[in-house]
Amino acid sequence: MTTQLSVNVNKIAVLRNSRGGADPDVVQAARACIAAGAHGITVHPRPDQRHIRADDVLALSALTREHGVEFNIEGNPFAPPRGDYPGLLQLCRATRPEQVTLVPDGDGQLTSDHGFDFAQDTVQLAELITAFKRLGSRVSLFVDAGNPDIARAATLGADRIELYTGPYAHAHASGQADTALALFANAAQRASAAGLGINAGHDLSQANLGDFLAAVPGVLEVSIGHALISEALYQGLDASVRAYVDILRSGHVSA
């Protein structure tokens, strides 16, 4: 089975919101990604709506259903509703995405930069996982590769984990990928042994994705946004998506 590509379109919304208009059109960009071979679309709506807004989530849900591809909504399940942000659970009730990825990011974070600490908030997290699964959504938890308690994600009711790959990308760029890859491979093995599916995301790029997939077993899906959109500035959006699809097709999911 080929690892699936879910394109995160947050950066398209960042560019649109910087001018306060409707361009670039997030839905049109997502449609182009799907046409180029993306297997799904990811969004991460935040309470401050600095990029993806609630109305984008509804529109992208309709688009992904029209094209029969996966819709993955990321977000902090503990963030309460405010203003025009109805809360992650309510957005998922309205759209019933195929996958919900829970991320413990705070309002002040520029981007997601750490996974869950399963020593905290486990009871509330388990209750929320149950609520999302009642919607028919697969639930994935954002985790650090070095977390010794990855198997607890299964105990809490999660279906998958998403490995936070920022540290790997940094190590790869500095020529020190081997140690990081060993850590991520071990994390994937521990997750698989616990019955969890494995996703990965954050700072994966055309330069480092192939090495990651060659070393880390069983990666079912990668979520890529910032690098893909950055590369699209030089290559074009269609070509950038196709380049990732080609990398994924050159490998396969190994147990």
UniProtKB/Swiss-Prot annotation:
Kindly list the residues the record flags as site (Transition state stabilizer).
162
Please report the organism this UniProt entry assigns to the protein: Xanthomonas axonopodis pv. citri (strain 306)
Q: Where in the cell is it found?
A: Cytoplasm
Functional pathway: Cofactor biosynthesis; pyridoxine 5'-phosphate biosynthesis; pyridoxine 5'-phosphate from D-erythrose 4-phosphate: step 5/5
Q: Which residues bind 1-deoxy-D-xylulose 5-phosphate?
A: 46, 51, 111
Give the matching SUPFAM superfamilies: Pyridoxine 5'-phosphate synthase (SSF63892)
Catalysed reaction equations from the record: 3-amino-2-oxopropyl phosphate + 1-deoxy-D-xylulose 5-phosphate = pyridoxine 5'-phosphate + phosphate + 2 H2O + H(+)
Which InterPro entries does the UniProt record give?
Aldolase_TIM (IPR013785), PyrdxlP_synth_PdxJ (IPR004569), Pyridoxine-5'_phos_synth (IPR036130)
- Ligand binding (3-amino-2-oxopropyl phosphate): 8, 19, 203, 225-226
The record ties this protein, via PANTHER family, to:
PYRIDOXINE 5'-PHOSPHATE SYNTHASE
Tell me the gene name: pdxJ
> By what name is this protein known?
Pyridoxine 5'-phosphate synthase
